[in-house]
Amino acid sequence: GVEDFAIECSLIKVGASEDMQNCADQGIQILGGMGFSADTPMESAWRDSRIGRIYEGTNEINRMLSIGLLLKKGMKGELELMPAVMKATMVMGSEKIEDIEDGPLAQENHLIENFKQLFLMIAGNATQKYGTNLEEEQQVLQALADILIEIYFSESAFLRTAKNISR
């Protein structure tokens, strides 16, 4: 059902609304020499992007939701998270640049895979350190969510680019 996509929905909501906020902020910076006023197109962009971070649940809540659901699914065995954490701990840093395959986007693919391994290592260390109290460590969870958002967006862009190249 729809619950199967709750993690992805939370990641997309947070990432997209914060990217929109950053774009509006850059627009204000560009138009800053003329002074911020309602006469610029950035006024509505800024307002809309700020409101977007609040609607449909605040970004902070969605960050907690995404990581919380991921860890719960891992603990229940719905996702093979713990075996992936163990594997990540063993293989991280074992490949050399020379070991990367040739081909279009090979380096990008390698980089994204390393991002994933790094996330798994950090999540595993956090789980080991805090155990069941991890849900109380909001700063750790927010940092994990931020990493996960970047991985999700990077891999989505990578997969779309790879699909376009293969056409």
Question: Which ranges hold each PLM region?
Answer:
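Alpha-helical interface subdomain recognition
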Residues: 1-167
